[in-house]
Amino acid sequence: MSLSNAPLGQHVAYPSQYDPGLLFPIPRATNRASLQLGATLPFTGVDLWNAYELSWLDARGKPRVAMATFSFPADSPNIVESKSFKLYLNSFNQTRLPNAQALRDRLERDLAAAAGAPVGLEFISPQRFGELNMAELDGIYIDKLDIEIDTYEPAPQLLQCAPGDEVEETLATRLLKSNCPVTGQPDWASLQVRYRGRPIDRAALLKYVVSFRQHAEFHEHCVERIFGDIMRACQPRQLTVYARYTRRGGLDINPWRSNFESAPPADVRTARQ
């Protein structure tokens, strides 16, 4: 499907009844071709989506609410366009269902069909809301480094290694900003880079992250671009790139890519989420 047909950036009426046809898949392969990624990916990964505005009607018409975390595997053929996902979830608002399991079943079925692969789902009932925590990404934050930069489109040539023996460390920043490729709206994120290899020059990494500031690309694609650029520039033996983007339309998106870890860390939202 062409992005010109996506609901993002268009005036779309909110649905009054359940409609799985609202989901708009976007092939991952299109963007990956521009990153020189083929069928064999250099990473494993997952896109964690947190839904904060999930509601439906029970069999007697009483509203119910919940939260949910969806896990889209990075090797699924498609991502789901975010506004279409929001509209789809809102289509349950006036839909009567016999129980929460009926909602789960529809969500799992519809999202798997859109993504082209099974999608993990954790359902969070109101009884568990008090258990949810906030935390910042682990790592050494590089935001206070004194840098000067006037480049605001991705500039992988800024990346460089520092002298020294191989290290194993985790670096983090809250200064990642990219933009929606359809609407131009800003997308804000915290970024974590965990690696083992030659030391990455921290000031160079911060400049590189800041260079995304006027770049227009979906969250998932930005993280894969960052992963590839770091691999080419510094060739770490192990690398994980993880971004937690701020919420929009009741959804936040948190792409995670790694060539050595089997699963992302606990899905704990940051203060800005």
Swiss-Prot record:
SUPFAM superfamilies: Tetrahydrobiopterin biosynthesis enzymes-like. It is found in: Cytoplasm. GO terms for cellular component: cytoplasm. Keywords: Cytoplasm, NADP, Oxidoreductase, Queuosine biosynthesis. It catalyses: 7-aminomethyl-7-carbaguanine + 2 NADP(+) = 7-cyano-7-deazaguanine + 2 NADPH + 3 H(+). GO terms for biological process: queuosine biosynthetic process; tRNA modification. Pathway: tRNA modification; tRNA-queuosine biosynthesis. NADPH binds at residues 82-83, 248-249. Its EC number is 1.7.1.13. The active site is at residues 180, 187. One of its GO terms (molecular function) is preQ1 synthase activity. It comes from the Bacteria. Substrate binds at residues 80-82, 219-220. Gene3D superfamilies: 3.30.1130.10. NCBIfam families: QueF. Belongs to the GTP cyclohydrolase I family. QueF type 2 subfamily. Homodimer. Catalyzes the NADPH-dependent reduction of 7-cyano-7-deazaguanine (preQ0) to 7-aminomethyl-7-deazaguanine (preQ1). This is NADPH-dependent 7-cyano-7-deazaguanine reductase. The gene is queF.
